Amino acid sequence: MFVEVSGTTPMLIGCATCHNPHGSDSTAELREPISTRDTTNLCIRCHMRNAAPDTANTRGPHSPQGPTLLGRSGWLPPGFVWDSTDVPTHANAAANPRLCVTCHMDTLNVNAAGGTLAWHYTGHGFYAAPCVDTAGVDSTDACDVSVRSFAACSASGCHASGGAARANFQAIEQEMAFLTGTLWTDVNGDGKIGSGDTGLLTQVPATEFKRDSIITAAEGALFNVQLVAVDGSHGVHNPPYLRALLTATIQAVKQKYGLSVPPAQAARLARLAAGLGRGVALR
């Protein structure tokens, strides 16, 4: 749902949100193109809010999916340089010309136990890995990853099978959980750094979170942890970028506040830093 700038009534996202009933120059009468890698992209026009920290806004990231896909989101630690032209497949206009739509609008036939067609999913739920059963696609999107359909990943030709894509997803999800957890795990889920929580940010003085005209390393790191959570893809939108960004963020927090992590964590972080590859500079 959304609310117009000049209004107060929540509006449902419907056909006319993306399609122009009066016609357009784009495919399927879309309001904007789907292949552009900037803010003129149909999906990114909305999914681009509060993708970087701003001293005028204390609510953190809002809908940062577009800039994250393009490698342009988050707080950039001192010395961190990312070559945004070195893009992974998901954001590569040549390898994936339909960008968001390839994953989020794949069609799917759901068969009954006997193999007959029970439901045809048109992709307009926008689930990249939908929950499916013989009744159709579960709109709660709350099922376990083991029963989600990763058919879009194999149909695109990017992954050998849905099972292979699922395994990749789980590996990326675990890696992001390790990196964000090294910075902060909100154990009680209250959205605040407090007693009982874990991670480097729990060891930083509270004065570093003043929310004034200066974005401290601690505030930037907190933003990046929130970025991964709010993005909602568990890191899949841009694994190389988020991996590099979080690794650099951890280094920045450790250096700024003189902190350390247990040896096992340090060894894993060192392996990640060594494998970041081209497109990244940590100075």
Label the predicted regions:
Residues 1-283:
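C-type cytochrome heme-c attachment and multiheme electron-transfer modules
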